[in-house]
């Protein structure tokens, strides 16, 4: 089963989905992982109800970082900003389908961090192990925008 997921990761790394930048996005953010050099830039367009209508990302990164963001962007259409902010790191880990070592966790979570930061309009709180801050607090932060 791990082989199937490894093939999926390599496919998303070689041909990432939603790769590029949207013109005139409603939300935008970029960040990097200074430990390994991964960089990602996310653009998001919202519909009239404030839900993700279209999302794109670009940048450079390792296979785990690129594949995780590619897989994640496939899942976000129709979600509200609040729903995006509540996504746990386990959601990304399930999408990847393989065990991620502690040293690669920041690679796997970079896309989620950048997408949450775009949704907040500011850097998302992020703990060292790659977990986003308290989702309830993130939702409260959104209300102050």
Stretch-by-stretch model annotation:
Residues 68-79:
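Alpha-helical support elements that line or immediately flank enzyme active sites
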Residues 1-24, 29, 53, 79-145:
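C-terminal binding/interaction regions
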Residues 36, 59-67:
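Short, thiol/selenol-centered motifs that function as redox-active sites or metal-ligating centers
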Residues 64-68, 107-110:
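Catalytic-loop motifs flanking and including active-site residues across diverse enzymes
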Residues 33, 38-48:
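Short beta-strand elements
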Residues 41-43, 55, 68:
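Short, glycine/acidic-enriched capping/hinge loops at junctions between secondary-structure elements
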Residues 50-59:
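Immediate flanking context of iron-sulfur cluster ligation sites
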């Amino acid at each position: 089963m791990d082989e199937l997921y490894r093939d999926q990761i390599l496919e998303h790394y070689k041909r990432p989905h939603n790769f590029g930048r949207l013109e005139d996005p409603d939300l935008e953010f970029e960040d990097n992982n200074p430990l390994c050099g991964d960089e990602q830039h996310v653009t998001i367009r919202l519909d009239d109800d404030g839900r993700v209508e279209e999302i794109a990302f670009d940048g450079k990164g390792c296979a785990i970082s690129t594949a995780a963001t590619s897989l994640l962007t496939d899942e976000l259409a129709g979600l509200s900003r609040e729903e995006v902010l509540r996504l746990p790191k386990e959601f990304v880990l399930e999408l990847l389908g393989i065990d991620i070592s502690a040293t690669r966790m920041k690679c796997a979570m970079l896309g989620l961090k950048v997408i949450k930061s775009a949704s907040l309009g500011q850097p998302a709180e992020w703990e060292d192990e790659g977990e986003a801050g308290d989702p309830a607090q993130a939702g409260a932060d959104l209300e102050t925008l």
